[in-house]
Swiss-Prot record:
Spectrin repeats lie at residues 272-378, 381-494, 500-602. PROSITE patterns: CRAL_TRIO (PS50191). Residues 1-153 form the CRAL-TRIO domain. It comes from Xenopus tropicalis. One of its GO terms (biological process) is blood vessel morphogenesis. PANTHER family: SEC14 DOMAIN AND SPECTRIN REPEAT-CONTAINING PROTEIN 1 (PTHR46607:SF1). The gene is sestd1. This is SEC14 domain and spectrin repeat-containing protein 1. Keywords: Repeat.
Length: 696
């Protein structure tokens, strides 16, 4: 019988076990009769419930029943005592009927319970409330009987309800846990072969029941302090009353079963987790080896241009994006498997490691294929980028070579040649880079066969190889054509440089001849003070003329070279109508001037030679006539020289030039005149002795 069923009756406190004990350690059962009408049925139910609480060992020590009749009638008391005979005759050892003062002494003295002892089965005594201590210790009596034992019926009832609830829940929970645990032991092998669908859970939370039991046990074990007199008394919830050992036993059983249950749950959770992991692993593996591999199996091209390679890269990025989702699942699964491996369940290690190894192998193989494909496409894009740059460079170089240049001078030609060489060097570097990129791409394509999954990729690879080699060969041919054109352009420009150089040097020769002519007119003025000096001047003049002749010949050769170069270059020399006439004109002027200079020096030499001969000799008298003729001749030559100094040099174009300045001519003429005077004076000296002889 549960307290909850008869809770309204129990709340009436028709009887109670206070927790007190008699001198034989038997429990004290108190029946507080009231003046109100007491229901014997309810009292019987209450007694049945209370007497079901103590253990058999406790019952064997017997009960002492206190029937408090101080507020009741004798008939009721008598009925209760007789009822005890029917309810608990074996357990009752003594019944203490607390009588009212001076009431029953007169009315019922004729009734002696002791006479009924054999029939009742227990001893009944009438005692006053203040005389109970003769039979029971004061600390085992409640306050209404003058004792110090504290009893709170509602507190006891509440704890009793808790106890019964705990007992009921724990017993039910133990049965449920036993079913779960035993079922798990029997079906453990089968559960490994099928998905776990046994999710049976206890009807109550084991943690809550355990907590309730611990709290109840704590209440049962604690002591209470009586605040009124400072004495210590046992709680009415004594272990003999509420079966503290029973609570402890239930708790121990619960802990044991709950521990097994937790292990079962852990094993089932682990099994479920393993099955889920295996399912997810197979999902990842099946997708990577199925649709994922098929996506890569269809992607073998490298594109034939930058745009095509970029489109393939974009397609590959979409494939990578799809793979990334599965790789994320792989990372999560790998972490879960690692956590389970760290848990160290030996029976699952082999299975977990097998799953992990297979998952890792598939994912790493697929990731390697993706990376290889990405690297291949990037290399192809780099190759096409280099090819496009090289093609643009070749187009630019070819365009530059196809345009006929007309440089104005050698510096411009040198600059153009330098630019051509730089472009050709850049093209050569670009072609070398293209070869390196192409060879790297060819190597990668060769290795691509290892990812073929059995597919024949020879056709795709051959197309890719032919495309790469075709681009490299085409670029090589275009470069070779450009090199040939550069060689032709270089030769032409070098000839143009030579042409410009010849023209410049020819113009320089004209300038030099002008300078020589100018020097001849302005500085080659003196005719010498004597024959020796005149000879020296004449010799210097011949050398001077040789220099001018060499300059003129050099200019003529340069102009002839320009004619040849112009014929080779199929162009018109800028010097053909300008420099050559200038050269011829200045050379003609120089020749005329030089001849005039030579003529004057020769006349001066003849004058000085004859004059010196006359002035240095002392002829005999027989030669006088001839000497006079020489004098006249010398004088005539001297005058001719003087006359010649005043004559300008007349050129074919009608222009005239004088040697030196008028002062220079005057100085030269003055010296000639001095010589003429000396000759005349010599002549006079010769004439005077002759006249003296005649006179004598």
């Amino acid at each position: 019988m549960d307290a909850t069923v008869i809770l309204p009756i129990l709340k009436k406190k028709l009887a109670f076990l206070s927790g007190g004990k008699d001198r034989r350690s038997g429990l004290i059962l108190t029946i507080p009769l009231c003046s109100d009408q007491t229901s014997m049925d309810e009292l019987s139910v209450t007694l049945d419930y209370l007497l079901s609480i103590p253990s058999d060992k406790c019952k064997a020590r017997g009960f002492t029943v206190i029937v408090d009749g101080r507020k009741s009638q004798w008939n009721v008391v008598k009925t209760v005592v007789l009822m005890l005979q029917n309810v608990v005759p074996a357990e009752v050892s003594l019944v203490c009927v607390v009588k009212p003062d001076e009431f029953w002494d007169k009315k019922v003295t004729h009734f002696c319970f002791w006479k009924e002892k054999d029939r009742l089965g227990f001893e009944v005594i009438l005692v006053s409330g203040n005389k109970l201590t003769r039979y029971i210790e004061p600390n085992q009596l409640t306050e209404e009987f003058g004792g110090s034992l504290t009893y709170d019926h509602m507190d006891w009832l509440n704890k009793r309800l808790v106890f019964e609830k705990f007992t009921k829940e724990s017993t039910s929970l133990l049965d449920e846990l036993a079913v779960i645990n035993n079922g798990s032991d029997k079906g453990s092998q089968n559960e490994k072969e099928r998905s776990v669908d046994f999710n049976y859970l206890p009807s109550v939370d084991p943690e809550t029941v355990l907590q309730t039991g611990h709290e109840l046990l704590s209440e049962l074990q604690q002591r209470r302090f009586n605040g009124s007199d400072g004495g210590v008394s046992w709680s009415p919830m004594d272990d003999e009353l509420l079966a503290q050992p029973q609570v402890m036993k239930l708790l121990d059983s619960l802990r044991e079963q709950y521990t097994r249950y937790q292990e079962v749950c852990r094993q089932r959770s682990k099994r479920t987790q393993l099955d889920e992991i295996q399912q997810k692993v197979m999902q990842v593996v099946n997708w990577l080896e199925g649709p994922g591999s098929e996506q890569l199996r269809t992607q073998w091209g490298i594109g034939d241009s930058i745009r095509a390679s970029q489109a393939l890269q974009q397609k590959h990025e979409e494939i990578e994006s799809q793979h990334s989702e599965w790789f994320a699942v792989y990372v999560e699964l790998n972490q879960q498997i690692a956590a389970l491996l760290n848990a160290g369940d030996e029976e699952d290690l082999v299975e977990l490691k097998t799953l992990q190894q297979r998952l890792s192998d598939v994912c790493y193989r697929q990731a390697s294929q993706l990376e290889f494909r990405q690297n291949l496409l990037q290399t192809a894009l780099d190759f096409h980028s280099v090819a496009q740059d090289l093609s643009q460079q070749l187009d630019g170089l070819l365009g530059m070579l196809c345009v006929d240049v007309a440089p104005t001078d050698g510096a411009a030609i040198q600059q153009t040649l330098k630019l051509l060489e730089e472009k050709l060097k850049s093209v050569d570097t670009g072609l070398q880079g293209l070869r390196e990129k192409g060879q790297g791409l060819l190597d990668q394509i060769t290795n691509q066969a290892s990812w073929a999954y059995g597919k024949d990729v020879s056709t795709e690879n051959k197309d890719n190889v032919d495309h790469i080699q075709g681009i490299m060969e085409d670029m090589q041919l275009r470069k070779q054509r450009c090199e040939d054109m550069v060689d032709v352009r270089r030769l032409k420009m070098l000839q143009m440089v030579q042409l410009f150089k010849c023209e410049e040097d020819a113009a320089q020769a004209v300038d030099w001849l002008n300078e020589l002519l100018d020097a001849l007119l302005k500085t080659h003025i003196r005719l010498g003070d004597d024959s020796q000096e005149t000879k020296i001047l004449l010799e210097k003049h011949r050398k001077f003329v040789d220099v001018a002749q060499s300059t003129y010949d050099y200019g003529r050769q340069l102009l002839q070279a320009t004619v040849v170069l112009c014929q080779s270059l199929r162009c018109t020399s800028r010097s053909s109508g300008d420099t050559l006439p200038k050269l011829n004109r200045v050379w003609k002027q120089f020749t005329i001037t030089s001849e005039e200079r030579v003529h004057r020096l020769e006349m001066a030499l003849a004058f000085h030679s004859n004059a010196e001969k006359i002035l240095q000799e002392c002829p005999d008298l027989g030669e006088t006539v001839m000497d006079f003729e020489q004098f006249d001749e010398v004088e005539a030559v001297g005058k001719s020289v003087l006359d010649r100094l005043t004559v300008p040099v007349i050129y074919p174009d009608g222009t005239e030039q004088y040697f030196g300045t008028p002062s220079d001519m005057a100085s030269t003429a003055e010296h000639i005149r001095e010589r003429i005077k000396m000759v005349c004076l010599k002549k006079q000296q010769l004439l005077e002795p002759d006249e003296s002889i005649r006179e004598s």
